[in-house]
């Protein structure tokens, strides 16, 4: 129940507590309460009844928490995230972030949807209901992301219609197909008219095309990277979500927009398990905002009240009738958490047992050296850049893998329908001197992607990923390190600390093989995404993203 008006008897009890005629279930006493509307801090009690805030003032409760010298703020809300990118399940993710003050997320589960479709989204909703995390969901709008790759499922108009009936589902997730919106593609428009809220995805879109995109219903954007671009989007009525993650960091460029009530701070799912454990989640984003000179209350608004108002979530403010999601801080500027309450209760966490069907998603045929042979001569080469998800294209004369020139072999193995398809290409930028790294995290279709020096290591790494039913594997003739990811082939069923330990082992082994990329796993995961320029590799072959077509390995 997200509104106190949903049940008459509960509403009666809440009103009685608010009047002072009935003891509250729980009271936070003598807190320094942050008023996000008047932008001030005042002292008072917070009375909770039936999971909602009943009143602010002087109250007594059946249970009380003394909060003298503590600052009370609403639980933080991540307005745009992809939990699967952390490689953690929802329950394990919740165990990490809720104690740090993040009590709500609005997730776009398009990663699992590309593997398991509607059933995968429903599984995440089911798991989330077993956690204290307020898990709101936007229906993935572009699954698959492109016809130039093979995904495990499709989310069409009918699936969107069915998912929108779920209580936690708020609207349509980032509409990446902005060309389809602007050109009034019928299927795209059919998806839009079903949804109340439509999140946008419009990098660099300006002028009349931006007008058309917004006129169609896209009401937010998290891809803004410049102040002028953000200012135009705000002027035209859009809400701007400012990313501050592990890789994509736009806060510095966009901090001039942060005083606006139509701006939010988000992670976009771009917080690695290492960074969550060592630095934090939205609490870290808040601290980054403070480091950039943003006022504490303005920063809080962008992480609480603003996303709540945009999505119509009954939270984000310490005020009567709001969900009693309260964070008590020892220090506001440092966001030093003393206590967290969700619905007026301290959160409890438990494990979730995933069904076997969610653990058997890798249906690929094992590869052999014969199946991954590459042409030589004058060829196209994918160029990767450290810390970037865009790639370049080079034309080189090659006679095969050339370690001295850092020209390696890349393969993408289809893993959803057992077609046996293998996309093959040359890639430069990984720096491997020997061995290979393979993984079943490959945005967005999550086929198996691998980069390596020799065929033996490539086959060893890819085939071990298949045996694990998903994961990340480093091989040098034989397996050197591995991280099993059995849930849809993209998430671990282990504790976050163990995931970090295994991931650290993988990165150490990759470094030993010569790679100097800051995040080799992330870089590898994006060379298969055929909607981000320039040259990508899918199971169907080399993709020229700007031309939106498969191209031949050999250059004309």
Curated annotation (Swiss-Prot):
It catalyses: adenine + H2O + H(+) = hypoxanthine + NH4(+). It is an enzyme of class 3 (hydrolase). GO terms for molecular function: adenine deaminase activity. Its EC number is 3.5.4.2. CDD domains: AdeC. The keyword Hydrolase applies. Keywords: Hydrolase, Manganese. Belongs to the metallo-dependent hydrolases superfamily. Adenine deaminase family. This is Adenine deaminase. It comes from Archaeoglobus fulgidus (strain ATCC 49558 / DSM 4304 / JCM 9628 / NBRC 100126 / VC-16). The lineage of its organism: Archaea, Methanobacteriati, Methanobacteriota, Archaeoglobi, Archaeoglobales. The gene is ade.
């Amino acid at each position: 129940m997200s509104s106190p008006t949903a049940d008459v008897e509960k509403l009666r009890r809440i009103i009685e507590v608010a009047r002072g005629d009935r003891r509250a279930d729980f009271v936070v006493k003598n807190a320094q309460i942050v008023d996000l509307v008047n932008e001030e801090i005042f002292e008072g009690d917070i009375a909770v009844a039936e999971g909602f805030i009943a009143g602010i003032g002087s109250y007594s409760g059946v249970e009380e928490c003394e909060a003298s010298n503590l600052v009370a703020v609403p639980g933080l809300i991540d307005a745009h995230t992809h939990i699967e990118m952390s490689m953690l399940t929802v329950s394990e993710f919740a165990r990490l972030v809720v104690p740090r003050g993040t009590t709500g997320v609005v997730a776009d589960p398009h990663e699992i949807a590309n593997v398991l479709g509607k059933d995968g989204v429903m599984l995440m909703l089911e798991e989330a209901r077993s956690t204290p995390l307020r898990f709101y969901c936007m229906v993935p709008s572009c699954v698959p992301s492109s016809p130039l790759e093979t995904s495990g499922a499709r989310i069409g108009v009918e699936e969107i219609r069915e998912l929108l009936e779920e209580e936690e589902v708020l609207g349509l997730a980032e509409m990446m197909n902005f060309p389809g919106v602007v050109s009034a593609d019928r299927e795209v428009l059919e998806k839009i008219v079903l949804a109340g809220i439509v999140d946008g995805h419009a990098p660099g879109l300006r002028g009349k095309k931006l007008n058309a995109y917004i006129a169609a219903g896209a009401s937010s954007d998290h891809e803004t990277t410049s102040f002028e671009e953000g200012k135009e989007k705000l002027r035209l009525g859009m809400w701007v979500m400012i990313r501050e993650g592990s890789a994509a960091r736009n806060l510095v460029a966009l901090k001039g927009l942060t005083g606006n009530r139509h701006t939010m701070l988000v992670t976009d799912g771009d917080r690695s398990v290492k960074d969550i454990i060592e630095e934090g989640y939205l609490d870290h984003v808040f601290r980054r905002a403070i480091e950039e000179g943003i006022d504490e209350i303005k920063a809080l608004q962008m992480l609480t009240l603003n996303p709540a108002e945009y999505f119509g979530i009954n939270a984000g403010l310490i005020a009567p009738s709001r969900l009693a999601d309260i964070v008590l801080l020892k220090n506001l500027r440092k966001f030093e958490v003393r206590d967290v309450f969700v619905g007026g209760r301290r959160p409890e966490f438990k494990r979730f047992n995933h069904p076997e069907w969610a653990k058997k998603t890798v249906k690929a045929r094992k590869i052999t050296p014969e199946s991954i042979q590459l042409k030589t001569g004058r060829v196209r080469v994918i160029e990767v850049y450290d810390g970037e998800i865009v790639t370049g294209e080079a034309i080189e004369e090659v006679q095969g893998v050339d370690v001295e020139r850092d020209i390696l072999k890349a393969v993408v193995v289809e893993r959803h329908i057992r077609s046996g398809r293998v996309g093959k290409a040359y890639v430069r930028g990984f720096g491997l001197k020997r061995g290979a790294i393979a993984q079943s995290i490959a945005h967005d279709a999550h086929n198996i992607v691998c980069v390596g020096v020799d065929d033996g290591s490539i086959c060893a790494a890819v085939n071990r990923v298949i045996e694990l039913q998903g994961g990340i594997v480093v091989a040098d003739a034989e397996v050197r390190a591995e991280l099993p990811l059995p849930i849809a082939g993209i998430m671990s069923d282990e504790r976050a600390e163990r995931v970090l330990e295994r991931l650290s082992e993988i990165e150490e082994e990759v470094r030993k093989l010569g790679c100097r990329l800051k995040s080799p796993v992330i870089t590898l995961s994006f060379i298969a995404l055929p909607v981000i320029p320039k040259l990508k590799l899918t199971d169907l072959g080399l993709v020229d993203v700007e031309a939106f077509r498969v191209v031949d390995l050999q250059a004309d």
